[in-house]
Every structure is written in structure tokens, then in C-alpha cells.
UniProtKB/Swiss-Prot annotation:
Pfam family, one: ADK
Subunit record text: Monomer.
One GO cellular component term noted in the UniProt record for this chain: cytoplasm
Entry's Gene Ontology BP terms: AMP salvage
Domain notes: Consists of three domains, a large central CORE domain and two small peripheral domains, NMPbind and LID, which undergo movements during catalysis. The LID domain closes over the site of phosphoryl transfer upon ATP binding. Assembling and dissambling the active center during each catalytic cycle provides an effective means to prevent ATP hydrolysis.
Stretches the record annotates as LID: 122-159
Family: Belongs to the adenylate kinase family.
Residue numbers binding ATP: 10-15, 123, 132-133, 203
Pathway(s) where this gene product acts: Purine metabolism; AMP biosynthesis via salvage pathway; AMP from ADP: step 1/1
Coiled-coil spans in chain: none
Phylogenetic classification of the source organism: Bacteria, Pseudomonadati, Pseudomonadota, Betaproteobacteria, Burkholderiales
Function (record text): Catalyzes the reversible transfer of the terminal phosphate group between ATP and AMP. Plays an important role in cellular energy homeostasis and in adenine nucleotide metabolism.
EC assignment: 2.7.4.3
Protein name (Swiss-Prot/TrEMBL): Adenylate kinase
Length: 218
């Protein structure tokens, strides 16, 4: 099972990736982890990437694709792999196609942006313990206070509505076009393109997992 998982930030990709990887016995590959591992291992590509990152530059798509090819050739990818957050742009998808990286499925987890904003901006946490709450779905007993200590809860910078909206804007501009890219390719060249599947990402975690497994079995 060679899979690309698509979806906006906050759509629940991380949760579903864990279940999919467990079911199929495949590793989850994110470009961030891959870059860090290559830099740590001191591979030629890792050394090259480190130079770019140390100078504050962005790692080129060519370098990322070469790292991807190196990573998926490792033994733990024999049964397949799941790409999370890659490709992020059309040029990366084109480069992956040109490099002959074969993918079986592209699975999109589709959640309306309003639902994502509500889901993320409603999160609150107790910094000392890491306990998390949600103002609507899992509220504390007393508004704004931790159930155990009674200390004030905070809203992380990442969860503030304007931060979430900004991330969704970047996703709309850069990554959302991949939905059309893969669905069009699947329609035009079904024999060589990955199978494209979209599922709704609203509902319980169990419902979404069930939809994901069903989509990947046909």
C-alpha cells in the first residue's frame, strides 16, 4: 500500500495516518522527519540539506525527491508507505511523477474550513500537565479552568483563529490544487495514475477510520 494522504491542517490526517499505518504495516513518512533523519545520519543528501537549512534557505524540490527515493528504498518500505504532508505543491507532484515514484492511492480527508476553524480554535490546554479540552466538544467543568488543579487554561498560538485561518489560506493556495491534480489524472489515465479517493472527515474518529479503510479496499 503506497499512499498519499491529503487534507487541510486540522482535518485529522495525523490520527488517520496512525490507524492506516498500523493496519497495513507501513511507515508514515513526513518530509520533516525524513530531512532530520538524513541530516542526523550524515548521508550525502543529508549534508547537502543541512547546508541549505543552516543558511536559512528552503530545501529544493529536487533534493526532497532524491531524499524520498532514498527513504522509500529502505527495508521498512517493502510493503509500502504513507506520505503525510508530501507532495505539498504541484511542482513536487510533477517531480515525483517524473522520478517514477509509484503510488497506489491518494486519499483526501475532506473537512469544511468552518468546521476546522471551530475544531482548532476551540482547543484549550493546561500547560503544566498537557491536559487538553475543547470549549464545545470536551469543556472543562468550570469554564477556562483545569479540572484537576483549577489553574487557568491557555489557547496555544497555533490554535488561535487567525493562525488557523492563515494556515488554511496557505493550504488553499499551495496544496489544495493537488486534489484536482490527482483526481483529473485518475480520470484521464486510470491505468497509470494512483486511485483517487475522497472521504468526509467529519464525525467520530471511528466513523472516519471506517470510511478510510473502505475507500482503500476498492
Amino acid at each position: 500500500m503506497k499512499l498519499i494522504l491529503l487534507g487541510a491542517p486540522g482535518a485529522g490526517k495525523g490520527t488517520q495516518a496512525t490507524f492506516i499505518c498500523q493496519k497495513y504495516g507501513i511507515p508514515q513518512i513526513s518530509t520533516g522527519d525524513m530531512l532530520r533523519a538524513a541530516v542526523k545520519a550524515g548521508t550525502p543528501l543529508g549534508i547537502e540539506a543541512k547546508k541549505v537549512m543552516d543558511s536559512g534557505g528552503l530545501v529544493s524540490d529536487d533534493l526532497i525527491i532524491n531524499l524520498v527515493k532514498e527513504r522509500i528504498a529502505q527495508p521498512d518500505c517493502a510493503q509500502g508507505f504513507l506520505f503525510d504532508g508530501f507532495p505539498r505543491t504541484i511542482p513536487q507532484a510533477d517531480a515525483m511523477k517524473a522520478a517514477g515514484v509509484k503510488i497506489d492511492y491518494v486519499l483526501e480527508i475532506d473537512v469544511p474550513f468552518e468546521a476546522i476553524i471551530e475544531r482548532m480554535s476551540g482547543r484549550r490546554s493546561h500547560s503544566a500537565s498537557g491536559r487538553t479540552y475543547h470549549v464545545k466538544y470536551n469543556p472543562p467543568k468550570v469554564e477556562g479552568l483545569d479540572d484537576v488543579t483549577g489553574e487557568p487554561l491557555i489557547q496555544r498560538e497555533d490554535d488561535k483563529e487567525e493562525t488557523v485561518a492563515k494556515r488554511l489560506e496557505v493550504y488553499s493556495a499551495q496544496t489544495r490544487p493537488l486534489v484536482a491534480y490527482y483526481s483529473d489524472w485518475a480520470t484521464e489515465a486510470p491505468d497509470e495514475a494512483p486511485k483517487y479517493r475522497a472521504i468526509s472527515g467529519t464525525g467520530t474518529v471511528e466513523e472516519i477510520t471506517e470510511r478510510a479503510f473502505k475507500a482503500l479496499s476498492n
